[in-house]
Design a protein with these regions (language model features):
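Short glycine-/small-residue-rich Rossmann-like dinucleotide-binding loops
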Residues: 98-99, 123, 250, 256-258, ...
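Residue-level detector of alpha-helix initiation sites
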Residues: 124-127, 142, 146, 202
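Phosphate-binding beta-alpha-beta segment of Rossmann-like dinucleotide-binding domains, i.e.
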Residues: 136-138, 143-194, 206-209, 213, ...
Length: 392
C-alpha cells in the first residue's frame, strides 16, 4: 500500500460546481502529430467536469482506494506546517499540477525519503528540481501533449487581444462609455505583422498553425529546425538565434520549457533588441522573462504589451507587479487547465498510474526523468546544469 499525495488548486469560491455551462465536450482521441490521447483502462469521471480542484480529486479516489492505497488531496502546499510538508516524508507518489505547483526543491526532495514518482498532471515539470530527482532516483513524468492545444488557443487569444486592445475596450463598454477613440488609440490589425515563436514544439507549432490564416509573417527560433515541408507549408522564417528573430518581430510568443538554457532569456538586453511597440505573449514559464525588465519595458513604452498566464511564484502574491503594470493581459495560470484539457491530463495521469502499479513501462512521451537521468521527452526538451543533453 502506497501513500499518494496530491496537491490541487482550491475549489471555486462559490463551492464545487453542481452544473456546468455546457453538457459535453468534444472527444479528442489523436493529436496533430499522431500521438494518441491518453488510453487508461477506465476513468471514473465525466469529461467536462472540474477535476483539477481539491473536490475533483483528478477523478482518482475510487481507483486508488480500490487498490488499497492511501490518497491524500490538499491545496495546502506552502511552508513547514502545511499538509504537504506533513505528508512529504512518507509519500511514495506526489501528484501536482503546474497551475498550483507543489514545489519540490532540493530540500523537500531530500526530506521525501520514500518518494519514487513525481507526477505532473499537466505539462511542465520545472517545479521539480530535476537534478535532485536524478540524484535521488525519483521518476518524473508528465502528460505530454494533453493540453498543448488548450495553451496554444490561449496564446492566440492573447496575441489578438493585445494587438487589438480588447481588454481596455471591454472595460469601456462595462463602464457605460462609448469612447471609440480611447478604444482605438492603441488598436491595430494583426494582418501583415511579423509573429515569432521561441521554440516550435507542440505548443509553438500549434500557435504558428493557428496564426497562419491571419496572413502574418511567421518566424521561429528553435534548437532543432523543423522539416523543409513544415517550413514551406507555413511559410516560416527560421532564425539561428533568438536575437535575430526578436529584431524583426512585432509579436513574440514564448513556448520553451523552463530550464537552465531558457532561464531569463528575455532580460533587459534581449528586450532592448526587440522593436519598439512589440508585444510578448508568454504562456510557457514566468522565469523565462526577467520580471522587472518586463515591467520597465511596458512602462517606458518599449513593449506595447505583455500577456501570459505564468507567474513566479504561483500563486502570485497580491502585489506582483504583472497584475497591475500597463498594457498587461495577464490571467492566472489557467490555459492548460480548461475543462477540455483536464479531461485529457487526468486520463493521462490515470494511465501513468495504471502503468506504474501494473509494472508496465510509462509511455516514452510522458517520461522526463527515469533511472537517474533525463529520459523520454525530458531528454529531448530539458537540460540540467551538470550535463547537457542534445540528442534528437
Ligand atoms: P514540447 O516538449 O512539445 O516542446 C518544447 C519545445 O521546446 C521542444 O520542441 C524543444 O525543442 C524546445 N526547446 C527546449 N529548449 C529550448 C531552447 N533553449 N531554445 C529553443 N527551443 C527550446 O512541449 P510543449 O510545447 O507542449 O510545452 C512547452 C512548455 O509550455 C512546457 O514545458 C511548459 O513549461 C509550458 N506549458 C504551459 C502550460 C500553461 O498552462 N500555461 C501548459 C502546458 C505547457 P528542441 O528540443 O528540438 O530544441
Amino acid at each position: 500500500m502506497a501513500k499518494i499525495l496530491c496537491v490541487l488548486y482550491p475549489d471555486p469560491v462559490n463551492g464545487y460546481p453542481k452544473t456546468y455551462a455546457r453538457d459535453e465536450i468534444p472527444n479528442i482521441t489523436v493529436y496533430d502529430n499522431g500521438q494518441t490521447a491518453p488510453t487508461p483502462k477506465a476513468i471514473d469521471f465525466k469529461p467536462g467536469e472540474l477535476l483539477g480542484s481539491v473536490s475533483g480529486e483528478l477523478g482518482l479516489r475510487k481507483y486508488l482506494e480500490g487498490l488499497g492505497h492511501e490518497f491524500i488531496v490538499t491545496s495546502d502546499k506552502e511552508g513547514p506546517d502545511s499538509e504537504f510538508e506533513k505528508h512529504l516524508p512518507d509519500a511514495e507518489i506526489i501528484i501536482s499540477q503546474p497551475f498550483w505547483p507543489a514545489y519540490l526543491g532540493p530540500e523537500r526532495l531530500a526530506k521525501a525519503k520514500k518518494l519514487k514518482l513525481a507526477l505532473t498532471a499537466g505539462i511542465g515539470s520545472d517545479h521539480v528540481d530535476l537534478e535532485s530527482a536524478i540524484k535521488h532516483g525519483v521518476t518524473v513524468a508528465e502528460v505530454t501533449g494533453s493540453n498543448s492545444i488548450s495553451v496554444s488557443e490561449h496564446a492566440v487569444m492573447m496575441i489578438l487581444s493585445l494587438v487589438r486592445n480588447y481588454i481596455p475596450a471591454h472595460e469601456w463598454a462595462e463602464k457605460g462609455g462609448w469612447n471609440i477613440a480611447d478604444c482605438v488609440e492603441r488598436s491595430y490589425d494583426v494582418e501583415g505583422m511579423h509573429v515569432g515563436t521561441v521554440a516550435a514544439g507542440r505548443i509553438g507549432l500549434a500557435i504558428l498553425k493557428r496564426m497562419k490564416p491571419f496572413d502574418v509573417h511567421l518566424h521561429y527560433y528553435a534548437r532543432h529546425r523543423l522539416s523543409k515541408e513544415e517550413e514551406e507549408e507555413l511559410g516560416l522564417t527560421f532564425h539561428e538565434n533568438v536575437e535575430d528573430m526578436v529584431k524583426v518581430c512585432d509579436v513574440v510568443t514564448i513556448n520553451a520549457p523552463l530550464h537552465p538554457e531558457t532561464h531569463h532569456m528575455f532580460d533587459e538586453a534581449m528586450i532592448k533588441k526587440m522593436k519598439r511597440g512589440a508585444y510578448i505573449v508568454n504562456t510557457a514559464r514566468a522565469e523565462i522573462c526577467d520580471r522587472d525588465a518586463i515591467v520597465r519595458a511596458v512602462e517606458s513604452g518599449h513593449l506595447a504589451g505583455y500577456a501570459g498566464d505564468v507567474w513566479n511564484p504561483q500563486p502570485a502574491p497580491a502585489d506582483h507587479p504583472w497584475r497591475t503594470m500597463p498594457w498587461n493581459g495577464m490571467t492566472p495560470h489557467m490555459s492548460g487547465t480548461s475543462l477540455s484539457g483536464q479531461a485529457r491530463y487526468t486520463a493521462g495521469t490515470r494511465e501513468i498510474l495504471e502503468c506504474w502499479f501494473e509494472g508496465r513501462p510509462i509511455r516514452e512521451d510522458y517520461v522526463i526523468v527515469d533511472g537517474g537521468k533525463l529520459a523520454g521527452t525530458g531528454a529531448l526538451s530539458y537540460t540540467v546544469l551538470e550535463h547537457h543533453h542534445h540528442h534528437h
